[in-house]
């Protein structure tokens, strides 16, 4: 079973692991301010009204800001901390520290911007919420407000391509043109609703690799997500006999950016299937007036190669930083001495 490099989508890691971020954990729920009894159980009371969900989704720079998407595939509660979107699962909170001001340039350039100080303030607010025990920040850099015991991932970056006003003006290299031409002889691309053979293709991929439970949950909720979110579109590639050769899902909720979230293809799909699916996804974005196609994180050299084939460039750096709100206890003599002398 093979899979096309996808846009990365939601960050999938278990809240029980050392590197925790957004973890799908069941069907979407209503905002917590509709359930006053949750506050008595320790939930914060600064939940967002639906109008703020729409504002974040309209200006989304990363998938975790697509509120309909996250709510369709998870049980996370949307909050707002210091003007940034955050997601809560019990004692764990994920702060999405990407916004319009925190994008182009390297990490050091980002740190010099006023928005960096705003992110640090949001980290402080998130850390002080009642019942929060662990915090993960998704941002272009490691926040200065992160404590010394915080753990950061290897720096990555979101990649993307600008979309012209006319699909005929897409900038393809000759090799990509040839692949698209070849694929179009063997497959037909069309928009479809979620079907059993889409689910089976996903299950084949899940069975082929030892995915974490959160990853399997996310993949198995692609169908409910496509069915629940009007601007989540599925493009399917089928051969002349109607057999499914692959599919891709794009999210068009944001006003200016299309997000390439998922892509799967059959093991023996014709060459260029992945490219033909992405081309259809981009063409729909152009038709709708979008100006940017977000291809997700680099992840590994193979996925970066796929993006570069499409003349993609880095949109913004990305680092995940996670920590326990309370300093972990140090065992042994050193920990005892530090406690004794107030260190």
Language model segments and positions:
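Intrinsically disordered, low-complexity segments enriched in small polar residues
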Residues: 3-9, 14-16
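Short, basic, low-complexity termini and linkers enriched in Ser/Thr/Gly/Pro
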Residues: 15-23
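A conserved beta-strand-loop-helix scaffold within acyl/acetyltransferase catalytic domains
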Residues: 26-89, 172-269
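A short, internal acetyl-CoA/4′-phosphopantetheine-binding micro-motif in the GNAT/acyltransferase core
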Residues: 98-114, 164-166, 262-271
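Aromatic (often tryptophan-rich) hydrophobic motifs at membrane interfaces
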Residues: 231-332
